[in-house]
Amino acid sequence: MLLSFRPDVYEKIKSGLKIFEHRRNFPDEPIMAYMYVSSPVKAITGVVYLGKRHCLSDWMEDYKEDSNAVTRIKEYIETYHYRYAMEIDRFQETSQIL
């Protein structure tokens, strides 16, 4: 799988700050994905290993007592139309592939 990332998001994954990747669709199994970093890099620069898939609508119920969490989850669902989050298990930087 090939996933595209903005440079700032790539850096958050690389540093370990970002622990979930949110998307509209994800397979329901752990995956390895090559990371394409968009402009100005425009290259494949890493590999990310994604683990368990979480359904954001389930999180709405799980975190219903935490208004801050519910607000963030709603933003992902309503603004970005994301349905899933996958745990970022591991990151591996590679040589740039242009």
Predicted regions and their residues:
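Structured alpha/beta reader/binder surfaces that contact nucleic acids or chromatin modification marks
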Residues: 1-98
